Amino acid sequence: MRKFLVTLLMIIACFVLQTAFFRYFAFGGTVPNCLMIITCSSGIMRGEKHGLLAGFITGILVDIFFGDFIGIYAILYMYAGFFAGLFHKIFFPENIILPLTIIIVGDFIYQFLCYVLFFLLRAKFQIGHYMTHQIIPEVVYTAIIALFLYPIILKINTKLDDIIQRSATKFV
């Protein structure tokens, strides 16, 4: 239960960071996808189910506040969290390369699927323009922010694991 509550608080914090804070630091109208960082981080650190749940909550938040249809972003973030969780077994906390790579790939696929769902299906075939003005800048910006945000998430996760383990040993 603690894991869920802490993850929920981190999702809300990342949502506020992405929508309120980084809005003032947008480069060319692009802000980093902090929600993808927390979704992929949750999956990597806790596994598929936790990543799936974090992705669902994150996606529903985006759907409610910014989506035209409820559920599209939820599905995209759920897939990102689930597939990030597949790498949980080979996750080493001191190695930032794997999580950063998963966040970059997850954000790229997320943006590409958004292009397909929202533009390509409406016969807007400007993939080059969308790639250079939306996808690549957001992925780069997200990667830069992930270098700073991921260690904070990792530290919170490690501290939470220590607290849970200490409280579990009290009852044994």
Question: Model features per residue range: what roles?
Answer:
Residues 1-172:
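Terminal, non-globular segments
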